[in-house]
Amino acid sequence: MLALIIAVIVSLEADFVQTKSVAMMNEPQVSTGHMTYRAPDYMQWAYRSPQQMVWEVDGNNSNVNPQVQRLLRMIMAAIAGEGEVDAKAQKESRKLFQSVNVVMDESGRVAQRVELVEKNGDTTLIEFTNVVTE
């Protein structure tokens, strides 16, 4: 996620499939949704299935808990291409995750997949499709 977009962009929209594997569960949890980013500080992460839920950060306003808000802000910093914020976001990600692996598309501008490995070994794989940037 920390290298979601290399070039500075004004907006980004994408569909996603998120697969969460938790050691205590036999089957992974699969969710689908849509994400929207608008510069400089708006992010919406909307789950469509299996349960509808929307996480949103708009400037200083947010409808999510502080940990989710930090995660969304890390994504926004990566999308915005803000060097100083990227360094801060990377430091913050080390507190939350054991590793963050990003697979870029052929252009090298947009992430196709992001794999997050939490400190406890649980993993989250996010695959992006239908990406539109401005």
For the regions a language model picked out, list residue spans one by one:
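Flexible, processing/modification-adjacent segments and terminal tails
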Residues: A7-V22, N26-P28, Q51, N60-K91
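Bacterial N-terminal signal peptides
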Residues: M1-I5
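A generic structural signal for short, solvent-exposed coil/turn residues
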Residues: I6-V8, E27-Q29, Y37, Y47, ...
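An acidic-aromatic
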Residues: H34-I79, D122-L125, N130
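N-terminal secretory signal peptides
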Residues: S11-A46, Q51-G59, N101, E115-L116
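Gly/Pro-enriched, hydrophobic low-complexity segments
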Residues: G83-E134
